[in-house]
Amino acid sequence: MKRVMLPLIMLLLSVQTFAQNSIEEQVKTLSNQKWQWMADKNVDSLNLLFDDKSMFVHMGGSWGKTQELNVIKGGGIHYKKAEVYSIIINIIGNTAILLNDIDLIAVVGGNEVINPFMVTEVYVNENGQWKMGSLTFSKLSRPVKIK
């Protein structure tokens, strides 16, 4: 009996680990795609990604989906490039929490700025589709790394 149980337990653990890694890769790819959509001001794709109840926290304030899309579309903030140095992904049930250490090159109020941020992204999987629930920019005290 022990001979049968141990391989079965090992198989179940490896399947669970594979599934977890697959989900993490899926969310990581989606996060990277989101940065590109933001740089391209692709509000149509972002509109599909952002949940209707999503919230966004920036250095200058916080707001919901409609205002975030309007800020991107109108150029209030142009996310030119996010240089991502590391991503930590935690999956809790149907929720993915990502911590991204980035340098962000953006145009804000007509001025190009570069800031180091820890960006927290929260995604929720509903009916097999990942939707962004929150995006928070926390400014880091470290120097900018991007050259």
Where are these regions (language model features)?
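Sec-dependent N-terminal signal peptides
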Residues: 4-15
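A beta-strand edge to alpha-helix "cap/lid" segment located at domain peripheries
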Residues: 7, 20-48, 53-147
